[in-house]
Regions:
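His/Asp/Glu-enriched, well-ordered alpha-helical/loop segment
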Residues: 11, 252-258, 303-391
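C-terminal cap of metal-dependent C-N hydrolases
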Residues: 14-17, 379-425
Length: 425
């Protein structure tokens, strides 16, 4: 029998919509050739002969997607949390990322990162590497072995780095990127390349033009940063005086959605014009609440993005953020939305559990296609959660149990994990 065809039994939770959970207690979740074939109160006769794993009353949720994190920064999580973004980059990030020129260091660091990602509730991720091609290929190889599905980027930066962390020229950066794409495009089953200009201050116009040509040639998605910090936004205005807002620094090179699937991390201080263009172009926003708090960047208006119909998912933004768990990001998103409502705009209601859960599952997962839900035809990404380590004498509803896991869980609560129908944990 096909090993990617099976049934899971338990308390099944997934999003019916942005604002509504579907919960089936003692339900059957069918995986057929790696895709969801339905959720049932009683197992249909046509699936009767399929192997079934009974998880009792444990919760079964869709796999989570981390839309934005920096793998090389995992080594120095929780360091420099008293600094703002630009000082933090120069003090911690750039010196540490320069170490990945050493492939032995890269192997050691990325093996720890990959193992912790495997133990997390995340099944998909969009990840920044460094500008070093050998180290980035090591990262891709390590992640591929875990079974997690990921997009990994070789970072481009030809200006405003450091002597140890900056490419020689736009041409050198582009040439290295093309060779890396050729080497990795079909090399790994689970991990694919994604174009990754670090952010506008790190990339000259010449480099952006070349990356645009590469994107059109290989039809790759793209990830970068947008409107995270006031100092960063002012710097972009100095570097790109002819742009009306930060996003135009990307869109002028056709690297802002449309025919170029795009993730922009943060979007904390996006202008009305920038938001309108993101919506028009279908840009995905990676909301990174923990990082935006740690680096004092501000509070992204996630409520506005949801209400106006923009694509938005969640990101851990390691190492601005400290936890790889997107369950933690859900809790953080709810908490900071309450501060935004109370301190900034009383018309922007706080996020609900249902909305944060959607953002962490289908909201971000849809960047990978039909991912992040148990509706028929979706890729079968699932996480089984056991909340027995969080005891209570209370009789809790499945939604209450899910909310407690969002706020209180760690990797000890993960019983099993499936990606595209394959059990990886």
């Amino acid at each position: 029998m096909n090993e990617r065809t099976f049934v899971l039994k338990g308390t099944i939770c997934y999003s019916n919509s942005l604002t509504e959970l579907s919960i089936t207690e003692n339900g059957y979740l069918v995986c057929e050739d790696g895709r969801c074939a339905g959720v049932f109160d009683e197992l249909p006769e046509k699936f009767a002969g399929i192997s079934c794993t009974d998880f009792g009353d444990e919760l079964i949720i869709p796999g989570l997607t981390d839309l934005h994190l920096h793998a090389p920064q995992y080594t120095f999580r929780a360091s420099g949390m008293d600094l703002e973004l630009l000082d933090w980059l120069n003090t911690y990030t750039f010196p540490q990322e320069a170490r990945y020129e050493n492939t032995e260091f890269a192997k050691e660091a990325y093996s720890v990162f990959a193992e912790d990602m495997k133990k997390s509730p995340n099944t998909r991720a969009c990840i920044f590497g460094t500008l070093h091609v050998p180290a980035t290929e090591i990262l891709m190889e390590q992640l591929d072995k875990t079974g997690i599905k990921a997009m990994v980027g070789k970072v481009n930066m030809d200006r405003n780095g450091s002597p140890q962390l900056q490419e020689e020229s736009a041409q050198a950066s582009a040439d290295a990127t093309v060779q890396w794409i050729k080497d990795t495009l079909d090399k790994f089953e689970n991990v694919k390349p994604i174009l990754t200009p670090r952010f506008t201050p790190s990339c000259s116009d010449e480099l952006m033009e070349k990356l645009s040509e590469i994107q059109k040639r290989y039809h790759l998605p793209m990830q970068s940063h947008l409107s995270e910090n006031f100092g960063e936004i002012a710097w972009v205005k100095e570097l790109c005086p002819n742009t009306h807002f930060y996003g135009e620094a990307y869109s002028q090179f056709d690297l802002f959605g449309g025919d170029c699937p795009t993730i922009m991390a943060h979007c904390v201080h996006s202008s009305d014009e920038e938001i309108a263009l993101m919506k028009k172009q279908g840009v995905y926003i990676a909301h990174c609440p923990q990082s935006n708090t740690n680096l004092a960047s501000g509070i992204s208006p996630a409520r506005r993005y949801l209400d106006e119909g923009l694509h938005i998912g969640l990101g851990s933004d390691i190492a601005g953020g400290t936890s790889v768990s997107i369950l933690r990001a859900m809790a953080d998103a709810i908490q900071v939305s309450k501060l935004y409502w109370r301190l900034v705009d009383l018309s922007m209601k706080p996020l609900t559990v249902e909305e944060a859960f959607y953002m962490g599952t289908e909201g971000g997962g849809s960047f990978f296609g039909k991912v992040g839900n148990f509706k028929e035809g979706y890729e079968f990404d699932a996480v089984v959660l056991n909340d027995s380590t969080i005891p209570t004498p209370l009789k809790l509803s499945p939604k209450d149990r899910l909310e407690r896991l969002i706020y209180l869980s760690d990797d000890r609560n993960i019983t099993a994990k499936y990606v595209a129908g394959r059990k990886i944990l």
